[in-house]
């Protein structure tokens, strides 16, 4: 289910001074409607959480940031997240609720954002 397929979504990846010891942050600068993207565009996936950081209390240390990760592994994780949302620990509660309860409504919402991204 790739509802966002065909869209062009701009994002900023910011690297801390102590990279690769700490993860970069990723924030979409275009509109997004996704359970794992905060309303302000910040991406919430395990690979971007520091080893000691477990904001939701469910992540294994092996799922979080490690200096062996690269920009490529981050991008692959984000692409995977876009097609397979994790609604167990949502960053956007409303998007997660719609994803769970009204899949057709979610699809329409995302398709509208995809159309907007290519205009």
Task: Specify the residue positions occupied by each region the protein language model found.
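N-terminal onset of structured domains
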Residues: 1-10, 17-19
